[in-house]
């Protein structure tokens, strides 16, 4: 494995080899740059330049995508092994108190250009340009000796057409050193921690406050004893006591105080009420109703006798058919006008005949 060969991942598809060369420009001499489908390899001349590229470009945005920069490991990159060994071979940039303030910077000077110039005096660990104040920058060195060397040798150095001024920062020794994540370059702000990471690591909430509370609760009511004792008590005693005491006490007043007096006191009163109420009318068991029901029914008449004499089929209808017709004759004679004298003898003769006929019918009846 070469310490000067770097792997670059998550490269946008529209990026070209010239774009990669311009992106890493200012970090020493680039010997080779190979661009493939979504990743590539960059080889520099000096191992220190390779280390700076890893520290400064890891997670940096390139043409709309955050790239991954790691030391190359053959044809395949092994990120797990890199994380274990990168701390020793490629330590992250550290913030020190050996800081110089650079003034009169050109607008075209970047932090990469400033860092390349400061390497002439020593090993810069952190550089920044135009971040807080336009036209000013900051440089930190790993040792105080490198800082003193840069202050004496590079003060007045011309960078992109302007001579810069270097002076020591008096407040650098009193400021606390910020913690910089290893994934990002030193001049970038630290990444925000996620609540999920604190939750997985077991923060104060879970370890100190919440879990002891659960342990205390479980210490009073273990899971096994709760199932063995409480549930058994509920099944054996608790449930039986509830049924025997609560529900039986609830039903006992109805059985002892309400229902029993109802059978002994209320029903006799109800009988007395009925007897007093029935005084005004005969009861079902009085003598009048017994005599009425014991009386023999009236004799049944024959249907033939009850029929009308004019009803066809009756005995009276067949016995005197002529009598009924003759009885209607005088009625018809009364409706007629008065007869003449020649007809009166005949009418008297008929009357005699009718009288004899009526007498005969009466005798037969």
UniProtKB/Swiss-Prot annotation:
It comes from Schizosaccharomyces pombe (strain 972 / ATCC 24843). It comes from the Eukaryota. Has a role in pre-mRNA splicing where it is involved in spliceosome assembly. Residues 184-194 have a biased composition (Basic residues). The modification Phosphoserine is found at residues 186, 188, 276, 294, 296, 298, 308. The keyword Transport does not apply. Signal peptide: none annotated. GO terms for cellular component: cytoplasm; nucleus; spliceosomal complex. SUPFAM superfamilies: RNA-binding domain, RBD. Gene3D superfamilies: 3.30.70.330. Belongs to the splicing factor SR family. It is found in: Nucleus. This is Pre-mRNA-splicing factor srp2. Residues 166-365 are annotated as: Disordered. Pfam families: RRM_1. Keywords: mRNA processing, mRNA splicing, Nucleus, Phosphoprotein, Repeat, RNA-binding. CDD domains: RRM2_SRSF1_4_like. GO terms for biological process: mRNA processing; nuclear mRNA surveillance; RNA splicing. One of its GO terms (molecular function) is mRNA binding. Residues 316-332 have a biased composition (Low complexity). Residues 6-69, 100-166 form the RRM domain. Residues 341-353 have a biased composition (Polar residues). Its main location: nucleus. Residues 195-307 have a biased composition (Basic and acidic residues).
């Amino acid at each position: 494995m070469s310490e000067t060969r770097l792997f670059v991942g998550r490269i946008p598809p529209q990026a070209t080899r010239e774009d990669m060369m311009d992106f890493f420009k200012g970090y020493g001499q680039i010997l080779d740059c190979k661009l493939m489908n979504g990743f590539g390899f960059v080889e520099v001349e000096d191992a220190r330049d390779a280390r700076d590229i890893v520290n400064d470009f890891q997670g940096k945005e390139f043409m709309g995508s955050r790239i991954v920069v790691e030391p190359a490991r053959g044809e395949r990159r092994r990120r797990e092994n890199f994380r274990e060994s990168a701390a020793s071979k490629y330590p992250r940039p550290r913030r020190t108190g050996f800081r110089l303030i650079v003034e009169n910077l050109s607008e075209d000077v970047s932090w990469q250009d400033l860092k390349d110039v400061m390497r002439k005096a020593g090993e810069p660990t952190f550089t920044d340009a135009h971040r807080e104040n336009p036209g000013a920058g900051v440089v930190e060195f790993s040792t105080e000796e490198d800082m003193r060397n840069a202050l004496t040798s590079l003060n007045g150095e011309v960078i992109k057409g302007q001579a810069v001024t270097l002076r020591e920062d008096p407040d650098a020794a009193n400021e606390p050193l910020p913690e910089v994540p290893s994934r990002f370059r030193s001049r970038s702000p630290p990444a925000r921690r996620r609540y999920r990471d604190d939750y997985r690591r077991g923060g104060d909430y879970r370890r100190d406050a919440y879990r002891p509370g659960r342990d205390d609760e479980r210490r009073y009511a273990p899971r096994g004893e709760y199932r063995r004792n409480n549930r058994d008590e509920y099944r054996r005693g608790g449930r039986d006591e509830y049924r025997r005491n609560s529900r039986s006490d609830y039903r006992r007043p109805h059985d002892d105080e309400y229902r029993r007096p109802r059978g002994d006191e209320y029903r006799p009163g109800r009988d007395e009420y009925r007897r007093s109420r029935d005084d005004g009318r005969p009861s079902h068991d009085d003598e009048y109703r017994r005599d009425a029901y014991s009386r023999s029914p009236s004799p049944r008449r024959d249907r033939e006798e009850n029929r009308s004499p004019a009803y066809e089929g009756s005995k009276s209808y067949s016995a005197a058919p002529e009598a009924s017709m003759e009885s209607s004759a005088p009625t018809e004679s009364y409706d007629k006008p008065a007869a003449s004298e020649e007809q009166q003898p005949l009418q008297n003769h008929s009357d005699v005949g009718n009288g004899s006929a009526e007498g005969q019918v009466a005798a037969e009846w």
